[in-house]
From Swiss-Prot:
Its EC number is 3.4.25.2. PROSITE patterns: PROTEASOME_BETA_2. Gene3D superfamilies: Glutamine Phosphoribosylpyrophosphate, subunit 1, domain 1. One of its GO terms (biological process) is proteolysis involved in protein catabolic process. Na(+) binds at G161, C164, T167. This is ATP-dependent protease subunit HslV. It comes from Campylobacter fetus subsp. fetus (strain 82-40).
Length: 180
């Protein structure tokens, strides 16, 4: 399991949101509390976040963005091409990172082995050491609470930060909202 972060992605009726906490841990020591582990890609049309080794994640972001540009922003094609490249490259297969990527139509988890997984419900995914806590909270809030997409992500990450020692409550989010 990758320690040191929690990333949650949510695709709601009016917008898609990605959020992450700010904690960077090394062993049992907190090195930084305000890191940003989420990004906007392709001029803000795609949202992405990572869990795992920071250096590995930046390499993956760069590679994914290059592939995303070559597919002219088609997220589905990009994740498939990314997975193919990841699986055939011996160096990439040793990287210790996972990514979540989403737009308004799709949400995908890209694993450290090159797997591409679209969540069963098509709208909520989480990675990192606090990912299961955030995922459970997001599912409950999605089902029972009357809150907007951004509040759902922030509250779910806050809950994860209160439970997981590798996750804090310094939360950053990015959003893609539907045009009005």
């Amino acid at each position: 399991m990758f320690h040191a972060t929690t990333i949650l992605a949510y695709k709601g009726n009016k917008g898609s949101i990605i959020g992450g906490d700010g904690q960077v841990s090394f062993g049992n020591t907190v090195l930084k509390g305000n890191a940003v582990k989420i990004r906007k890609l392709l001029g803000g049309k795609i949202l992405a976040g990572f869990a795992g080794s920071t250096a590995d994640a930046f390499n993956l972001f760069d590679m994914f963005e290059r592939i995303l540009e070559s597919t002219k922003g088609d997220l589905l094609k990009a994740v498939i091409e990314f997975s193919k490249e990841w699986r055939k490259d011996k160096v990439l297969r040793k990287l210790e990172a996972m990514m979540l990527v989403l737009d308004r139509e799709h949400i995908f988890l890209l694993s450290g082995t090159g797997d591409v997984v679209e969540p069963e419900d098509g709208k909520i995914a989480a990675i990192g050491s606090g990912g299961n806590y955030a995922l459970a909270a997001a599912r409950a809030l999605d089902k029972f609470a009357d809150i907007n997409e951004e509040e759902l992500v922030k509250e779910s990450l806050k809950i994860a930060g209160e439970i997981c020692i590798y996750t804090n409550t310094n939360i950053k989010t990015y959003a893609l909202w539907d045009e009005k």
